[in-house]
């Protein structure tokens, strides 16, 4: 397989003022430039499920695969991000906190189902977006199980992927996710992923509001590769 698969961690793609505190927002024009750059560099987007299919020998990965991920499930993922994504013929995964569905500024059930029909993988970001490390075992199980069940009951095809709220992971979490039929989970640790990476501890590169334009984006991609090469990971 390639030397490693980067996973980019986005949240919002919208026209908002970063001075208002939206540090996790990438303006649409910056997002377009980032996707243009990825295409120029020969990257092809895949989903977490496709990564796992390739790991099991059921799918061949492209020469330079990359995963675009979006946490929380903001409505601008549908109204703003998706058209830009489709214009670049790219894929993504959206990790949804289910108790936010239908609330102001968040995705609705109809939007989630349509996004899945248009090639976006839908994953779980728990029910209440509470860091799982702050909960007891029973509450952790509830957050993991209920979010998956609720989405599948509401017409989302099988949910296989998970994102840890705040990127916080406890030692027992990978096994809990496996027992509840998840196939992958993403953390907040920077780095690249190979078939040897624990699929429940996949590493991501955070993409916040770009204060320094496209150069910052390029440096963040480079940082993930360097950290992997040096073996600087938490997991």
Outline where the language-model segments fall.
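C-terminal active-site subregion of NodB/CE4 polysaccharide deacetylases
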Residues: 1-69, 75-78, 134-235
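Histidine-centered catalytic micro-motifs
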Residues: 8-12, 121-129
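Active-site flanking residues adjacent to catalytic metal/cofactor-binding acidic residues
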Residues: 70-71, 124
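Acidic (Asp/Glu)-rich catalytic clusters
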Residues: 82-90, 107-124, 178, 196
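Short, glycine/acidic-enriched loop or turn micro-motifs at the edges of active sites
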Residues: 74-75, 128
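Alpha-helical scaffolding within the catalytic cores
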Residues: 51-54, 77-82, 101-118, 146, ...
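Short histidine/acidic/glycine/proline-rich micro-motifs that form metal-
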Residues: 98-102, 131, 165-168
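Short beta-strand and adjacent tight-turn residues that come in two discontinuous sequence segments
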Residues: 95, 125, 187
């Amino acid at each position: 397989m390639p030397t490693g698969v980067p996973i980019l961690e986005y949240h919002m793609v919208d026209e908002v003022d970063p001075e208002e505190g939206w540090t996790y927002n990438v303006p649409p024009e910056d997002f377009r430039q980032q996707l243009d750059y990825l295409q120029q560099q020969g990257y092809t987007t895949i989903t977490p499920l496709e990564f796992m299919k390739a790991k099991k020998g059921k799918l061949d990965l492209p020469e330079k695969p990359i995963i675009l991920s979006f946490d929380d499930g903001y409505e601008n993922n549908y109204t703003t991000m998706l058209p830009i994504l489709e214009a670049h013929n790219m894929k993504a995964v959206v990790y949804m906190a289910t108790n936010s569905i239908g609330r102001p500024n968040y995705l609705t059930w109809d939007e989630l189902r349509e996004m899945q029909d248009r090639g976006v993988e839908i994953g779980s970001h728990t029910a209440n977006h509470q860091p799982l490390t702050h909960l007891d075992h029973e509450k952790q199980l509830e957050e993991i199980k209920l979010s998956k069940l609720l989405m599948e009951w509401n017409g989302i095809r099988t949910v296989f992927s998970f994102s840890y709220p705040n990127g916080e992971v406890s030692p027992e979490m990978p096994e809990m996710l496996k027992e509840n039929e998840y196939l992958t989970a993403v953390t907040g640790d920077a780095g690249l992923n190979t078939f040897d990476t624990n699929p429940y501890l996949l590493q991501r590169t955070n993409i916040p509001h770009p204060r320094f334009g496209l150069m910052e984006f390029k440096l963040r991609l480079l940082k993930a590769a360097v950290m992997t090469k040096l073996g600087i990971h938490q997991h």
